[in-house]
């Protein structure tokens, strides 16, 4: 017997019970994005490898260890996208969306990183991201954070996430800080692990977010990034904090927060949670004013964030037991008797014409009324429409609320209006 082919490790199937939750989560996220004036953009899953090397940075874990890279038949190096910002910027430059314009874009889809699979972290994962181009003040940074806070309230997880915030300054300020940090690390090189030694000269700021407790203890005496900020970055950060204070959004300034991608400057932030075990990041982003120019476009201020949907869904399921998944079926049509099935199908089509948003399923499995009602319950229907020979003859139907058992007989011509009222369509 041939061996069964299974999904690749770290790349998961999501079955109907899962996708009902995902669809409801995504619906909430998209509604909020729309309320802030964002438009969707869709980019390819595969991009030229140099895009990510130039954008993310060659001396990063993502580029060095985690990208799925291959040569096509023409010998061109291609990569499955590990994140969305670089592709969004590439598309904006290529199609003339960015220069001297304000753009608010969002995207959603699968990303790929070769990591050790664990809860909430997979080799194929899904992100939703938002990017704003053409605005350089701290107000838009604050509004993006305020928008994410609105997400948490809508999803019922606001009490289980907290905001960490930092400014990593301008490129020049970071260069000055980099020199001071390297000098400090050189004085304590015997304490550094191999990973930190490797990064000390190539990307020393990444030492700041080392998970090694000995390194974290050492960094208590290291130079503080905040002491090296340029005046403009300091003023920008103060403006951001002032706006968040005014909006009542709590935050903690974490001067070791630098983010893992090289393109950030000034504002960086993370929403974190400890409700899934060890503290994990739910949503992260920041400002990347130099990336558009770095990828060949005109200098354009930009700020954005991305969020992993797997971890978000896990968090919603863990802390919000009242969260309702997307309903697959609102109304289930039950029919019994000679010639009734055809009448039920035609009734269902008329109801779909009248109520395009209605989710309606007609029973095709036969069986007595008891079995058909059991199927309606299995599909999670809220309402059953019952047709028998008498109802067809009299152009009537029975409508039954499956939550409380109440039922009534009414004319078929009144069914659409009654369902619209009951389901608030």
Curated annotation (Swiss-Prot):
**GO BP terms in the entry:** histidyl-tRNA aminoacylation
Q: What is its EC number?
A: 6.1.1.21
Top-level EC class: ligase
An example GO CC term for this entry is:
cytoplasm
Task: Quickly give the catalysed reaction.
Answer: tRNA(His) + L-histidine + ATP = L-histidyl-tRNA(His) + AMP + diphosphate + H(+)
Q: Which UniProt keywords apply?
A: Aminoacyl-tRNA synthetase, ATP-binding, Cytoplasm, Ligase, Nucleotide-binding, Protein biosynthesis
Gene Ontology MF annotations:
ATP binding; histidine-tRNA ligase activity
A Pfam family found in this protein is: HGTP_anticodon
Q: Where in the cell is it found?
A: Cytoplasm
**Family listed:** Belongs to the class-II aminoacyl-tRNA synthetase family.
Question: Subunit structure, briefly?
Answer: Homodimer.
Record's protein name: Histidine--tRNA ligase
Q: Which organism is it from?
A: Erwinia tasmaniensis (strain DSM 17950 / CFBP 7177 / CIP 109463 / NCPPB 4357 / Et1/99)
Q: Name the gene that codes for it.
A: hisS
């Amino acid at each position: 017997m041939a061996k069964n082919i299974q999904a690749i490790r770290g790349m998961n199937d999501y079955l109907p019970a899962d996708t009902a939750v995902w669809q409801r989560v995504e619906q909430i996220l998209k509604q909020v994005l729309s309320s802030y004036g964002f438009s969707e953009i869709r980019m390819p899953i595969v991009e030229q490898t140099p895009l990510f090397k130039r954008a993310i940075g060659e001396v990063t874990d993502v580029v060095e260890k985690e990208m799925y890279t291959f040569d096509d038949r023409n010998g061109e190096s291609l990569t499955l996208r590990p994140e969305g910002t670089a592709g969004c910027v590439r598309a904006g430059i290529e199609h003339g969306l960015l220069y001297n314009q304000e753009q608010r874009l969002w995207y959603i889809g699968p990303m790929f990183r070769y990591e050790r699979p664990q809860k909430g972290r997979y080799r194929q994962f899904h992100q939703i991201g938002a990017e704003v181009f053409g605005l350089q003040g701290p107000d838009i940074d604050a509004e993006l954070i305020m928008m994410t806070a609105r997400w948490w309230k809508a999803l019922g997880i606001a009490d289980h996430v907290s905001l960490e915030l930092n400014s990593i300054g301008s490129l020049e300020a970071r260069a000055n800080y980099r020199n001071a940090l390297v000098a400090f690390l050189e004085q304590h090189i015997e304490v550094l692990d191999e990973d930190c030694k490797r990064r000390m000269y190539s990307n020393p700021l990444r030492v700041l977010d080392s998970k090694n407790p000995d390194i974290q203890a050492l960094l208590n005496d290291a130079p503080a990034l905040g002491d090296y900020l340029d005046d403009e970055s300091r003023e920008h950060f103060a403006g951001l904090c002032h706006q968040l204070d005014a909006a009542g959004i709590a935050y903690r300034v974490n001067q070791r927060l630098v983010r893992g991608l090289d393109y950030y400057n000034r504002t960086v932030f993370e929403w974190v949670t400890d409700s899934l075990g060890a503290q994990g990041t739910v949503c992260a982003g920041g400002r990347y004013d130099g990336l558009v120019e770095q990828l060949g476009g005109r200098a354009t201020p930009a700020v954005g964030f991305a969020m992993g949907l797997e971890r978000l869904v896990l968090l919603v399921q863990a802390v919000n037991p009242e969260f309702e998944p997307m309903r697959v079926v609102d109304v289930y049509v039950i029919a019994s008797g000679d010639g009734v099935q055809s009448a039920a199908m035609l009734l269902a089509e008329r109801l779909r014409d009248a109520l395009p948003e209605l989710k309606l399923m007609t029973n095709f499995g036969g069986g007595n009324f008891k079995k058909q009602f059991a199927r309606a319950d299995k599909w999670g229907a809220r309402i059953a429409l019952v047709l028998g020979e008498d109802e067809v003859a009299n152009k009537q139907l029975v409508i039954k609320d499956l939550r409380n058992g109440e039922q009534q007989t009414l004319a078929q011509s009144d069914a659409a209006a009654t369902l619209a009222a009951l389901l608030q369509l």
